[in-house]
Regions:
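Alpha-helical substrate-recognition element adjacent to the catalytic core
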Residues: 2-150, 241
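Short linear interaction motifs
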Residues: 1-2, 196
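Generic structural signal for hydrophobic core residues of well-folded globular domains
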Residues: 40, 272, 327-331
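Extended alpha-helical scaffolding segments
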Residues: 316-334
Length: 334
């Protein structure tokens, strides 16, 4: 029997989707380095050196390599099941203000007539993220995960997410087709029927792995924010991302009320509330014009849809970059 997918439909109010990387965006360090690596008697630096070496020597995806290395290192040392991974996740530290951030921003949105939804798009482990204190704050967690045998022991990757495949989840969020196996993400939607337009998306990340998502969101007038550790104040990565036009803004990863990030995101929500009123008028005018002319010229919409589908299955950065550039041309021609 085929699975019946639950899809989110367009709301009567505008929706803002805030999408987050996890490691070094919501947490100061890689999640694997906050308990798991130490439990198998390894050093953090040597673990990543071995994992990345495995990937390089075998033309292997780096994320598949770290997942394989985790399974191998656990043999005979620790139980490697979902509960154990969630327990490691419970130990993961979060940046200041993260625990109260999600509700606070949702509440602010409601005061402005805007629905705010939070999403994770991470190459880290879903099971560990599900073990954190904030797991229930997200509409959906898109992250790498394991397949478990009948005894509950991790055997094989069930899902792996790398820096280029991250972009497909933005399209799922855009259309409300959140299940990873829902082919409805390829369906055509009229612009006025899109649940969360890219212009109403915010992507918060810290490094190169976030660039494809940031670039895609930027190309459709969305909002990309680079964050850096507020303790070290090392801004080299955000400076580089700003120079390369990957981000529009950067702030410390301080999620407390009144922080730079707090004020910035609230300003984006305020802007969205005003802009969507204008867009509603635009769509009404457009529908009237189409009705008067008796036909719809949706050539550009169809071309955008084709490029979007190509982007969803792209696994190479160069190909992803080319597709996003073509999408941007369509946007700029409107």
């Amino acid at each position: 029997m085929s699975k019946e997918f639950i899809r989110k439909t367009k709301e009567s109010k505008p929706v803002v989707a805030i999408c987050y990387d996890f490691d070094k965006t919501l947490s100061p360090d890689d999640m694997q380095a906050q308990g798991y690596i130490q439990s198998v008697g390894d050093e953090v630096e040597s673990f990543w050196k071995e994992s990345n070496g495995l990937a390089e020597e075998n033309d292997m995806d780096q994320n598949l390599a770290y997942m394989f290395t985790m399974i191998q290192k656990a043999h005979g040392k620790v139980i490697f099941n979902k509960k154990a991974l969630m327990d490691y996740g419970a130990k993961v530290q979060l940046f200041p203000g993260v625990e109260t951030w999600f509700k606070r921003i949702r509440d602010y949105g409601m005061e402005r007539g805007v629905i705010v939804e939070h999403y994770i798009i991470s190459s880290g482990l879903k099971e560990m993220i599900e073990g954190t204190k904030v797991a229930n704050e997200f509409e959906k967690i898109y992250a790498s995960s394991f397949y478990y045998d009948k005894d509950g022991v991790a055997q094989w990757p069930a899902q792996v997410i790398n820096y280029t495949s991250k972009t497909q989840f933005l399209f799922r969020i855009e259309k409300g087709t959140l299940d990873v196996n829902d082919s409805g993400v390829n369906d055509y939607f009229k612009p006025e029927d899109i649940r969360i337009p890219f212009r109403n998306m915010v992507y918060i990340g810290d490094s190169d792995t976030d660039i494809p998502c940031m670039k895609l969101i930027n190309s459709y007038s969305g909002h990309s924010i680079g964050v850096y550790n507020p303790k070290t104040k090392d801004k080299r990565k955000v400076y580089k991302m700003m120079e390369d036009k990957r981000i529009k803004y950067y702030t410390p990863a301080d999620y407390t009320e009144g922080s730079e990030l707090d004020k910035l995101v609230k300003t984006i929500i305020d802007t969205t509330a005003s802009n969507e009123k204008l867009m509603a008028v635009h769509y009404i005018n457009k529908q009237e014009q189409v009705s008067h002319n008796g036909q719809i010229d949706n050539k550009e919409d169809k071309e955008k849809e084709k490029l979007s589908m190509d982007l969803e299955i792209s696994h190479r950065f160069k190909h992803t970059h080319t597709i996003i550039s073509e999408l941007k041309k369509i946007k700029n021609s409107n």
